[in-house]
Amino acid sequence: MILNRQKRVRVALPPLEKFARRVGRELGLDGRDVSICLVSDAEMARLNKSFRGKQGPTDVLSFPSSEEAASRRASSKSIGDIAIAPMVARRNAKRYGRTLPDELRILILHGVLHLMGYDHERDSGQMERRERLLRRRLDLE
């Protein structure tokens, strides 16, 4: 399920919901739920400060529902929540020469990998390699 809690960027939700289900199938998460919320830059900055101690908005934040979910062992139906800032995504899309829908799909994939326990800041490139492979498989490259 995707909730749009921002008003600055127009986003078509059904294609993103379809993509999120496809990511779940690719990663073996059938029957598991991920909640995705599109938030304003101000809300993302607040979340980024509260949970990471960093100033300003970021593009995506992931909140695993439990430690077990983060380490891929949970039996819970929900693996967690993802917050995405479409304004940041739009700026990044322009910078990287992508469309906004593609950038949002990349952020969904990135967020789900974090929910599964991947951590690009600590895993010696494991998450980056997995994400690159999945981007090719999901026609994002």
Regions flagged by a language model, labelled:
Residues 1-102, 113-141:
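An acidic/histidine-cluster motif and surrounding catalytic segment
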Residues 106:
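Conserved SAM/SAH cofactor-binding pocket of Class I
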